[in-house]
């Protein structure tokens, strides 16, 4: 059976960066956990990080990413590129199955094990099974309302949880 889970969304707007993750972990056709924590602050509280995929793999990548952040003096983009290079070329790391979503006040990045570091044009990004729904909702709210980043994230995650069966409404939110 396959573990399925997660929607993690980040929105950066008007000087605020807000990330949210749902709490559901699904194994096959069974919900195993409702309150998983898939996001956290790292880098002395200046960086938000979330994951989709294997929890053990994500924790290993969080630790490595935090080391890269320290090594590169908090430069999010450089740390992300260096992690992606290691992840792609290291034989052990290459086997890790996770996606990372990281953000600071200025940058939003998705990091994958294939060496990709993607910076969205509009500072809105999501990973996981509910990502398309969360991104669509966030972009619609950004384009048509004056809501702040936190309100956009809350409403978008609620919408994603109503559509994606692998996403629940038990949302954890972090803000910088």
Curated annotation (Swiss-Prot):
It is found in: Cytoplasm. Gene3D superfamilies: Glutamine Phosphoribosylpyrophosphate, subunit 1, domain 1. Allosterically activated by HslU binding. Keywords: Allosteric enzyme, Cytoplasm, Hydrolase, Metal-binding, Protease, Sodium, Threonine protease. Its main location: cytoplasm. InterPro entries: ATP-dep_Prtase_HsIV_su, Ntn_hydrolases_N, Proteasome_sua/b, Proteasome_suB-type. GO terms for molecular function: metal ion binding; threonine-type endopeptidase activity. CDD domains: protease_HslV. GO terms for biological process: proteolysis involved in protein catabolic process. Its EC number is 3.4.25.2. The keyword Protease applies. It catalyses: ATP-dependent cleavage of peptide bonds with broad specificity. One of its GO terms (cellular component) is HslUV protease complex. Na(+) binds at residues 161, 164, 167. The keyword Zinc does not apply. The active site is at residue 6. Protease subunit of a proteasome-like degradation complex believed to be a general protein degrading machinery. A double ring-shaped homohexamer of HslV is capped on each side by a ring-shaped HslU homohexamer. The assembly of the HslU/HslV complex is dependent on binding of ATP. HAMAP family: HslV. Belongs to the peptidase T1B family. HslV subfamily. NCBIfam families: ATP_dep_HslV (TIGR03692), PRK05456.1 (NF003964). This is ATP-dependent protease subunit HslV.
């Amino acid at each position: 059976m396959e573990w399925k889970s997660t929607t993690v969304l980040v929105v950066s707007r008007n000087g605020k960066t807000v990330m949210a993750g749902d709490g559901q972990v699904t194994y096959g056709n069974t919900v195993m956990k409702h309150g998983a924590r898939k996001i956290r602050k790292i880098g002395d509280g200046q960086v938000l990080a979330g994951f989709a995929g294997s929890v053990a793999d994500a924790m290993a990548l969080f630790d490595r990413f935090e080391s890269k952040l320290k090594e590169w003096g908090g430069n999010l983009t450089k740390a992300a590129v260096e992690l992606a290079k290691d992840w792609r070329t290291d034989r052990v790391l290459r086997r890790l199955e996770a996606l990372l979503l990281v953000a600071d006040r200025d940058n939003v990045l998705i990091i994958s094990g294939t060496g990709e570091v993607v910076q969205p044009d509009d500072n809105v990004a999501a990973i996981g099974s509910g990502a398309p729904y969360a991104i669509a909702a966030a972009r619609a709210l950004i384009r048509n309302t004056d809501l702040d980043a936190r309100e956009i994230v809350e409403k978008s995650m609620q919408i994603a949880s109503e559509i994606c069966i692998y996403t629940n409404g038990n949302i954890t939110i972090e803000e910088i």
